[in-house]
């Protein structure tokens, strides 16, 4: 006699839970978004939010799931801008070059995250800007059309405007002063 899936260890229980929550959300006309730990058993109409590595985006997209890319590196802004630099965010490919056309269509967007357990509320704005600007341009601009030097030149006027409106820019400018 086979055990019910929810009694087949942690993965079985998690799979059972995800499917139950999915049914509840569908009943209320909502779309499920789940972390990439569920990629291998996520219902096809759910969205997979990938935070660990692109391999999970490939697993989810291969199954037909839509995907949001928010990889820990470089998208977690609560980590030091000296490790997750503005340039690494700017140059990041949301969609790997080796994805098929069908897989590329299933990448519906990207997201940067800032988790409050490390920085203080006061630090969050400085950690977010200017890196959020680099992320925005990287998501909206095809990799072959990006120009890091042109982007850097455009930042200073934006910084001046935002600071005049009370937005704090952080110290993550190290990569602005390095060649290319």
Regions found by a protein language model. Give the residues of each.
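Short, small-residue-biased leader/transition segments that mark boundaries at the very start
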Residues: 1-3
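Substrate-binding groove of N-acetylhexosamine-processing glycoside hydrolases
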Residues: 5-180
């Amino acid at each position: 006699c086979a055990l019910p899936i929810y009694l087949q260890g942690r993965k079985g229980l998690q799979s059972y839970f995800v499917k139950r929550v999915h049914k509840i959300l569908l009943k209320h006309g909502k779309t499920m978004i789940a972390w990439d730990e569920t990629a291998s058993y996520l219902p096809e109409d759910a969205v997979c939010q990938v935070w660990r590595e692109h391999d999970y985006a490939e697993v989810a997209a291969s199954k037909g799931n839509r995907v949001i890319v928010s990889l820990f590196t470089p998208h977690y802004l609560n980590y030091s801008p000296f490790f997750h630099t503005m340039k690494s965010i700017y140059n990041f490919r949301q969609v790997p070059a080796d994805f098929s056309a069908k897989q590329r269509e299933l990448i519906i967007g990207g997201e940067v995250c800032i988790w409050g357990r490390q920085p203080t509320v006061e630090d969050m704005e400085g950690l977010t800007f200017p890196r959020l600007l680099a992320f925005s341009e990287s998501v909206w601009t095809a990799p072959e059309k990006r120009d890091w030097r042109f982007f850097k030149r455009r930042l200073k006027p934006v910084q001046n405007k935002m600071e005049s409106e009370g937005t704090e820019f952080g110290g993550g400018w190290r990569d602005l002063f390095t060649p290319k």
